[in-house]
Amino acid sequence: LSPDIKKIRDYCKRKKIILIEDNCESLGAKFEKKYLGTYGDFGTFSFFYSHQITSGEGGMIICKKKEDYEILKSLRSHGWSRDEKTSRKYPHLDPRYVFINSGFNLRPTDIQAAIGISQFKKLEKFRSIRSENREKIINSLKSNAKWKNQFHFIDVPKKVSPSYMVFPIIL
């Protein structure tokens, strides 16, 4: 469940703190009808096999500033820059060999991308099924005489639209 992300965002702005939203287990969740991951400076999402959608492995980072986008693009490709501005800065170097950051090989394969894109199209359906499953579990436990007083469930605030990967149960 989402905290009041607007309050967190506003606090971060006042204190000049970069807000990175970890949404690895809440892809598709919303706060006040706006997707989580879009309130901060960066939003992270996971496509691990057990999450809301999968591409087998990997994930996604979103950001608001073009400068941050260029840095992230470089980091995911061994620190390599494909930016024309960098090429102009080092005209005597072959741009295929200009590495401006330490980086990683985090580029998805074409197959992973195709799987991920097809899964994105089903995200809202998956989110709806997970919500229905949560309700079925809660109703089943509440209707069982043996268990109905053993479990307590967290109420979902009206301004939150979860994307359940898991949900808390209080014993």
Regions found by a protein language model. Name each.
Residues L1-R14, K30, K66-L171:
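PLP-dependent aminotransferase class I/II
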Residues L1-S55, M60-D68:
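Active-site phosphate-binding strand-loop segment of PLP-dependent enzymes
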